[in-house]
């Protein structure tokens, strides 16, 4: 799979990132390198390899489960084109 300049611009638009025309070729190369690496990973034979979540045994620290909005709701939705009550508004796609 190869990423072209139009795809770079579309990804930037969807991510709400400003990208100049001078940056597009560099980003195109970076994205193509990432995709090439992922394709290499897909070729690795993992038959018989036991799934793991970490290379070292770890115990997660437990804490009380309390509700906390983080007081950053306004910052989270600041770049969204449409919001209501700290929620993202998206176009209806299913009738």
Swiss-Prot record:
It comes from the Bacteria. Its EC number is 6.3.5.-. Allows the formation of correctly charged Asn-tRNA(Asn) or Gln-tRNA(Gln) through the transamidation of misacylated Asp-tRNA(Asn) or Glu-tRNA(Gln) in organisms which lack either or both of asparaginyl-tRNA or glutaminyl-tRNA synthetases. The reaction takes place in the presence of glutamine and ATP through an activated phospho-Asp-tRNA(Asn) or phospho-Glu-tRNA(Gln). Heterotrimer of A, B and C subunits. This is Aspartyl/glutamyl-tRNA(Asn/Gln) amidotransferase subunit C. PANTHER family: GLUTAMYL-TRNA(GLN) AMIDOTRANSFERASE SUBUNIT C, MITOCHONDRIAL. Belongs to the GatC family. It catalyses: L-glutamyl-tRNA(Gln) + L-glutamine + ATP + H2O = L-glutaminyl-tRNA(Gln) + L-glutamate + ADP + phosphate + H(+); L-aspartyl-tRNA(Asn) + L-glutamine + ATP + H2O = L-asparaginyl-tRNA(Asn) + L-glutamate + ADP + phosphate + 2 H(+). It comes from Rhodopseudomonas palustris (strain BisB5). Keywords: ATP-binding, Ligase, Nucleotide-binding, Protein biosynthesis. GO terms for molecular function: asparaginyl-tRNA synthase (glutamine-hydrolyzing) activity; ATP binding; glutaminyl-tRNA synthase (glutamine-hydrolyzing) activity. GO terms for biological process: glutaminyl-tRNAGln biosynthesis via transamidation; regulation of translational fidelity; translation.
């Amino acid at each position: 799979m190869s990423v072209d300049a139009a795809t770079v611009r579309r990804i930037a638009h969807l991510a709400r990132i400003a990208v100049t025309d001078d940056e597009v070729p560099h980003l195109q190369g970076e994205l193509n390198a990432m995709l090439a690496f992922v394709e290499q990973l897909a070729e690795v034979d993992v038959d018989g390899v036991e799934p793991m979540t970490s290379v070292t045994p770890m115990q997660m620290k437990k804490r009380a489960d309390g509700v906390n909005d983080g007081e950053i709701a306004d910052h989270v939705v600041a770049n969204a084109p449409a919001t209501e009550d700290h929620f993202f508004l998206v176009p209806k796609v299913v009738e």
